[in-house]
A protein has these predicted regions:
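Flexible "cap/lid" loop of the alpha/beta hydrolase fold
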Residues: 106-114, 118-148
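Alpha/beta-hydrolase fold catalytic core
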Residues: 1-30, 51-54, 176, 236, ...
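Active-site loop/oxyanion-hole signature of alpha/beta-hydrolase fold enzymes
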Residues: 7-10, 21, 40-50, 56-99, ...
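Structural cue for short, hydrophobic secondary-structure segments
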Residues: 31-34, 57
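Alpha/beta-hydrolase active-site loop signature
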Residues: 36, 60-64, 129, 244-247
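Active-site glycine-rich loops that stabilize anionic/oxyanionic intermediates
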Residues: 26, 34-37, 102
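Conserved alpha/beta-hydrolase catalytic His-Asp/Glu region
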Residues: 144-200
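Conserved loop-alpha-helix segment in the C-terminal half of the alpha/beta-hydrolase fold
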Residues: 202-254
Length: 267
């Protein structure tokens, strides 16, 4: 399995999907997943994009096949940005398009704000503009385990009409995260305010949102689309009439074509 040897404590698992014509020089898309996810979260998106773009996915520090971290590990937005910079430099070597799911948008927005030289565009799928995370998440994880937490929170994540087998699959994926990583991540993510980076972002930006409601968005850190538009007047906003806060997972066949159309307009 491919791993990047970036530092003694960060050797991320990664995948490259490239179905472009071998005589062309495609641009690169880098995916950044959210809490308790991995490269597997992008599997339905890759076929839409890999015929025209070189697609890079990787497991963030602490998640998937990248090594877990200890409970007392100190996550920070700056650390995740540095990790992302090193992945881009090693696997692309030039500016990239970035697609971020949920809290993956925190480091993506900071990178776009502070290192515009590395970013062609960003696509943010339901990013948390204020601190995400339910107050009862960690106590429930500690009492019942990661898999039970994943299943309990799945209806708001995927929507009330999500097929049972989809709920099972995402529960297995997200429930595999180490409780030590979850403790460290939640301690960090609860302090973030990604929305403050919006005014500094100038690259082409697509934001995919779902309708705001307490039921679906209280734990996701989302804000009304008007707030996003005010913070990033240049952004293209796609508002989906769905009762979930993770449409990139629940409705990839809606979201991925929107993103592909957005990129094609930049060409």
């Amino acid at each position: 399995m491919p791993y990047l040897d970036l530092s003694p404590d960060f050797k991320p698992y990664y995948e490259i999907h490239d179905a472009t014509d071998p005589w062309t020089r495609p641009q690169t898309i880098v995916f950044v997943h959210g809490f308790t996810e991995s490269t597997e979260a992008f599997r339905a998106w890759v076929p839409y994009l890999s015929r025209q773009y070189r697609v890079v996915t990787y497991d963030l520090r602490g998640f998937g096949r990248t090594a877990p971290v200890d409970s007392d590990f100190t996550y920070s937005t700056e650390l995740y940005v540095d990790d992302l910079v090193r992945v881009i430099n090693h696997l692309a070597g030039e500016p990239v398009h970035i697609v971020a799911f949920k809290s993956g948008g925190i480091s993506t927005m900071r990178l776009a704000a502070t290192r515009p030289d590395l970013v062609r565009s960003i696509t943010l799928a339901c990013p948390p503009m204020v601190a995400p995370g339910g107050a009862d998440w960690q106590p429930f994880m500690e009492a019942h385990g990661m898999r039970a937490w994943a299943r309990k929170t799945m209806p708001s994540r995927l929507g009330k009409d999500a097929p049972p087998r989809a709920i099972d699959w995402w529960t297995d994926l997200m429930g595999a995260t180490s409780i030590t990583t979850a403790r460290a991540y939640l301690r960090w993510v609860g302090t973030t305010e990604a929305g403050k980076d919006m005014p500094a972002i100038t690259c082409p930006t697509l934001v995919i949102l779902t309708k705001l409601s307490e039921q679906t968005n209280v734990a996701a850190g989302q804000v009304p689309p008007e707030t996003v538009q005010k913070g990033m007047p240049h952004a293209e906003i796609k508002l989906l009439d769905l009762d979930c806060y993770h449409p990139a997972a629940s409705h990839p066949d809606l979201c991925a074509p929107v993103m592909l159309s957005f990129l094609q307009k930049l060409a």
